[in-house]
C-alpha cells in the first residue's frame, strides 16, 4: 500500500437554497462521501467541503412570497440541508454559504484580477424586460423555444434538450415566467467574461486525458459550435453581491457559486489550524482538486470555471467527476406518484445505510443514470447485508461468546483463505479510487459468499456437539469472524454506521492498512444486532408520505402565487372554448408497442401505438425526459387520434401523445388507471 500521503480537496455541487434536499441530490453526495472516506482510510490528507448556493432571483422572489428577508430564508434552508446531510452520514469537513464574507472577498478579488488581465469587457446590450413587473428578466425567468434545436419551453440561458447556451433574446417566442407577459427589449450596460480567450487552454485541458470521455466529447461539441463571451452581470433588483464601482449591477449567481467552493475551504482554514489555503488554490499548488457534479451543470464547470481560475492566475481542478440522474422504478422521480422523495422523508422511515449501499452497488465512473428500483432495493439490501454479511458474524459470535468468553483463537484456521481475502485489497482499492463502486461491491460480495461457504462446509454447529473438538470450534468461528472483519473493512467507506457498530463488536478500529492484520488471541465484545432488514411496508409508507408532502407543497406554492402574484411556473389559461370545440378532439387510450430514440434528433422518440383497431406511428419530443425509451413499451398513454398526419424528416407522424410539464427534461406522460384498453375514447 502507498505510504505517500496525498493532499486532496473535494467538493460537491452547491444545493440551491430555496428548496429541500431529495434523493437525486443524495446520489452525488453519497458518491463523493464514499470516495472521501476511502481516501481517509488510506491515510491521505483530504478535505471535503460544500455550501448552499444562496443567491439569485428565485431566492429573492420566494422570500418575498413568504414575507421574509432573503437572508432569513437561506439561513433556514441551510439548517435543513445540513440536517439532511448529517442524517445520511455525509462527512463534510465544512458546510458554508455563498452569502458569506469569504465568498464576497474572493469574488471581488477574482473579478479584479480578471479585469486587470483584460478578461472583463463591458458593452450595452438589449435585454428582455417585463413591462408588467418593471424588471429586467434573469435568464431562468424567461422561457421560449430553443434557437438551436427548436425544443419548446426552454429557459433563457441554456437548453435542457441539446445543452446549448445562448442569450435570452435569442429565444423564439419568449415569455416572462414572472407575469406571463411578453417581454420587451430594453438597453442596459453589462459585464462580460472573455471566454473565447481561453480556447487554447481549454482545448489542452480536454486533451489531457483526465476528464471522463463523455465530458471531453461534449466539450468538443461546444468548441465546434464556438465559444461566446459570458454575461456575468445582472440588473437590480437582485439578491447577490454588487459589482464594485456600480450602482445597480450584481454578479450573476453562476459567477459566485463555484467560487463558493473556495469560500467554504477558506472558512475551514480559519476554523482549523494547519491548513494553508494557498497550498490548495495557488497556481503552483501540488494538491489535488476534484469536483463531483451532476451532468446538468457540466457546461459551467468544464468551461467557465476552469477559464475563470486560469484568468485569475489560480489552479484548475484535476478533474470533474460527473454523474447522471436518479430515476425511480425506471421513471423520472414523480411528485404525484410519491417517488420524488425528500431526504428528510426518507430518514423518517428507512436506514440511510440502505440507500448508501444500493447507490454504491450501482455506481460506476460513467455518466449513466441510476435507477432506484424499489423491489430490487429491498432484495439487494436484505440479501447482501442481512442474510450474507451480518449473518456471517452472528452465526460465529454466539459460539465464541458462550464457549470461549469472547476470546478469539491464537491462530488462523485457514491462512490460505485469509490471504486470498487480503490479496483482493488493492483491486478493491483501485475500484474505489476510480469510482467504480459497483465493481468494488461485487468483489466484496463474492468474498462474502466464499466466507459463508467456508462456515457452511466447516459446520461449527456440528463441531460444537463434540467436546473433543473444542479447539477446532474456536478456530473455525474465529476464522469466520476474521473474514467478517476484513469484509467490513472493505465496506467501511460505504457503510460507516455499520462499520462503527462492527468495530465496537470486534473491539478494534479498522483502517485499510490494518485489515491485513488478524485479531489473534483477541477479546471481542458480546454480539448485538448490527443491521435490520428492509421492510417493503416501510417503503410504501414513505411513498404515501411523499405524496401527501408534495401535495401540500403544491398547495402552498399555488396559494403563494395567487396571494403574491410574484412568480408562477405555469402558463396562463388559454381563452375559453365551447363544448363543441372540445368534442372535435378525439382522445384515445393507446398502448405503446415499441418505442425507440430517433438518432438524428436531439428530442424525438418514435412510438408504434396500438389504438384498438389499428396501429399508428407517432413522433414525440420527450427524449430528454425519458432516457430509456424501451422502458415505455407496454404502458398506456393518451393520444390525439384525429390530428392530421404530419410528414416529418424522419417519417410520418400520425397523431400526438399527451404529456404535461415545462418541456425538455420536465415532461410527464399522462397515465390511465388499470382496466383501460387500447382504443377506448377519453371522455
UniProtKB/Swiss-Prot annotation:
What this protein needs as a cofactor is: Zn(2+)
Cellular component GO terms held in the UniProt record: cytosol
**MF GO annotations:** ATP binding; metal ion binding; methionine-tRNA ligase activity; tRNA binding
The positions annotated for binding Zn(2+) are 146, 149, 159, 162
State where the protein is found: Cytoplasm
Segments traversing the membrane: none
Gene Ontology biological process terms from the UniProt entry: methionyl-tRNA aminoacylation
The EC number on file is: 6.1.1.10
Instruction: Identify the residue span(s) of motif 'KMSKS' region.
Output: 332-336
Gene3D superfamilies reported in the protein's UniProt record: HUPs (3.40.50.620), Isoleucyl-tRNA Synthetase, Domain 1 (1.10.730.10), Methionyl-tRNA synthetase, Zn-domain (2.20.28.20), Nucleic acid-binding proteins (2.40.50.140)
Motif 'HIGH' region, residue range(s) on this chain: 15-25
Q: Which InterPro entries match?
A: aa-tRNA-synth_I_CS, Anticodon_Met, Met-tRNA-synth_bsu_C, Met-tRNA_ligase_1, Met-tRNA_synth, Methionyl/Leucyl_tRNA_Synth, MetRS_core, MetRS_Zn
Boundaries of every tRNA-binding domain copy? 581-683
UniProt keyword Protein biosynthesis, yes or no:
yes
Q: Which UniProt keywords apply?
A: Aminoacyl-tRNA synthetase, ATP-binding, Cytoplasm, Ligase, Metal-binding, Nucleotide-binding, Protein biosynthesis, RNA-binding, tRNA-binding, Zinc
CDD domains on file? Anticodon_Ia_Met, MetRS_core, tRNA_bind_EcMetRS_like
Q: How is the cofactor bound?
A: Binds 1 zinc ion per subunit.
Which reaction(s) are listed as its catalytic activity? tRNA(Met) + L-methionine + ATP = L-methionyl-tRNA(Met) + AMP + diphosphate
Q: Which Pfam families match?
A: Anticodon_3 (PF19303), tRNA-synt_1g (PF09334), tRNA_bind (PF01588)
Residues the record lists as binding ATP:
335
Classification via PANTHER family: METHIONINE--TRNA LIGASE, METHIONINE--TRNA LIGASE, CYTOPLASMIC
UniProt lists the family membership as follows: Belongs to the class-I aminoacyl-tRNA synthetase family. MetG type 1 subfamily.
Under the subunit heading, UniProt states: Homodimer.
Summarizing the function annotation, the protein's role is: Is required not only for elongation of protein synthesis but also for the initiation of all mRNA translation through initiator tRNA(fMet) aminoacylation.
What's this protein's name?
A: Methionine--tRNA ligase
Amino acid at each position: 500500500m502507498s505510504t505517500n500521503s496525498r493532499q486532496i480537496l473535494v467538493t460537491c455541487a452547491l444545493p440551491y437554497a430555496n428548496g429541500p434536499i431529495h434523493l437525486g441530490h443524495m446520489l452525488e453526495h453519497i458518491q463523493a462521501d464514499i470516495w472521501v472516506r476511502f481516501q481517509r482510510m488510506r491515510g491521505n490528507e483530504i478535505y471535503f467541503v460544500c455550501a448552499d448556493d444562496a443567491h439569485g432571483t428565485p431566492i429573492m422572489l420566494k422570500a418575498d412570497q413568504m414575507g421574509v428577508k432573503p437572508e432569513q430564508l437561506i439561513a433556514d434552508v441551510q439548517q435543513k440541508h445540513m440536517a439532511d446531510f448529517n442524517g445520511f452520514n455525509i462527512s463534510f469537513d465544512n458546510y458554508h454559504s455563498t452569502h458569506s464574507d469569504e465568498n464576497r472577498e474572493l469574488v471581488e478579488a477574482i473579478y479584479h484580477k480578471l479585469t486587470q488581465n483584460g478578461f472583463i469587457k463591458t458593452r450595452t446590450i438589449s435585454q428582455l424586460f417585463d413591462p408588467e413587473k418593471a424588471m429586467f428578466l434573469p435568464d431562468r425567468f424567461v422561457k421560449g423555444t430553443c434557437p438551436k434545436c427548436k425544443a419548446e419551453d426552454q429557459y433563457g440561458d441554456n437548453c435542457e434538450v441539446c445543452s446549448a447556451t445562448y442569450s435570452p433574446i435569442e429565444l423564439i417566442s419568449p415569455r416572462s415566467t414572472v407575469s406571463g407577459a411578453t417581454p420587451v427589449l430594453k438597453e442596459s450596460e453589462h459585464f462580460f467574461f472573455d471566454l473565447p480567450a481561453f480556447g487554447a487552454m481549454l482545448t489542452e485541458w480536454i486533451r489531457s486525458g483526465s476528464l471522463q470521455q463523455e465530458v471531453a466529447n461534449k466539450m468538443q461539441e461546444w468548441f465546434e459550435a464556438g465559444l461566446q463571451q459570458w454575461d456575468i452581470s445582472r440588473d437590480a433588483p437582485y439578491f447577490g453581491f454588487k459589482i464594485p464601482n456600480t450602482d445597480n449591477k450584481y454578479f450573476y449567481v453562476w459567477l459566485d457559486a463555484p467560487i463558493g467552493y473556495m469560500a467554504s475551504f477558506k472558512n475551514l482554514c480559519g476554523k482549523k489550524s494547519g491548513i494553508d489555503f494557498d497550498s490548495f488554490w495557488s497556481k503552483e499548488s501540488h494538491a489535488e482538486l476534484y469536483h463531483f457534479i451532476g451532468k446538468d451543470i457540466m457546461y459551467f464547470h468544464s468551461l467557465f470555471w476552469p477559464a475563470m481560475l486560469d484568468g485569475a492566475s489560480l489552479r484548475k481542478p484535476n478533474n470533474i467527476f460527473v454523474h447522471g440522474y436518479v430515476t425511480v422504478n425506471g421513471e423520472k422521480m414523480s411528485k404525484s406518484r410519491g417517488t420524488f422523495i425528500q431526504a428528510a422523508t426518507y430518514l423518517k422511515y428507512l436506514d440511510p445505510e440502505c440507500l448508501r449501499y444500493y447507490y454504491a452497488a450501482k455506481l460506476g465512473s460513467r455518466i449513466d443514470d441510476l435507477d432506484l428500483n424499489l423491489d430490487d432495493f429491498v432484495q439487494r439490501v436484505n440479501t447482501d447485508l442481512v442474510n450474507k454479511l451480518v449473518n456471517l458474524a452472528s452465526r460465529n459470535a454466539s459460539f465464541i461468546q458462550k464457549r470461549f468468553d469472547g476470546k478469539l483463537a491464537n491462530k488462523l484456521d485457514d491462512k490460505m483463505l485469509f490471504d486470498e481475502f487480503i490479496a483482493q485489497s488493492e483491486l478493491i482499492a483501485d475500484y474505489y479510487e476510480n469510482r467504480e463502486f459497483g465493481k468494488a461491491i461485487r468483489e466484496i460480495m463474492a468474498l462474502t459468499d466464499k466466507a459463508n461457504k467456508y462456515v457452511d462446509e466447516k459446520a461449527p454447529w456440528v463441531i460444537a456437539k463434540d467436546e473433543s473438538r473444542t479447539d477446532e470450534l474456536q478456530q473455525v468461528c474465529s476464522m469466520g469472524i476474521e473474514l467478517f472483519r476484513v469484509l467490513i473493512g472493505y465496506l467501511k467507506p460505504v457503510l460507516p454506521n455499520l462499520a462503527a457498530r462492527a468495530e465496537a463488536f470486534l473491539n478494534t478500529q479498522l483502517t485499510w492498512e490494518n485489515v491485513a492484520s488478524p485479531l489473534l488471541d483477541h477479546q471481542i465484545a458480546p454480539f448485538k444486532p448490527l443491521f435490520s432488514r428492509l421492510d417493503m411496508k416501510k417503503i410504501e409508507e414513505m411513498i404515501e408520505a411523499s405524496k401527501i408532502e408534495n401535495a401540500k407543497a403544491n398547495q402552498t406554492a399555488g396559494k403563494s402565487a395567487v396571494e403574491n402574484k410574484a412568480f408562477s411556473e405555469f402558463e396562463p389559461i388559454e381563452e375559453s372554448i365551447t363544448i363543441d370545440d372540445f368534442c372535435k378532439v378525439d382522445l384515445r387510450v393507446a398502448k405503446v408497442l415499441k418505442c425507440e430514440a430517433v438518432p438524428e434528433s436531439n428530442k424525438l422518440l418514435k412510438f408504434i401505438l396500438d389504438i384498438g383497431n389499428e396501429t399508428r406511428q407517432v413522433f414525440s419530443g420527450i427524449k430528454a425526459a425519458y432516457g430509456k425509451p424501451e422502458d415505455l413499451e407496454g404502458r398506456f398513454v393518451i393520444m390525439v387520434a384525429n390530428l392530421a398526419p404530419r410528414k416529418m424528416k424522419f417519417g410520418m407522424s400520425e397523431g400526438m401523445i399527451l404529456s404535461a410539464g415545462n418541456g425538455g427534461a420536465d415532461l410527464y406522460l399522462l397515465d390511465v388507471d388499470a382496466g383501460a384498453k387500447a382504443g377506448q375514447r377519453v371522455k
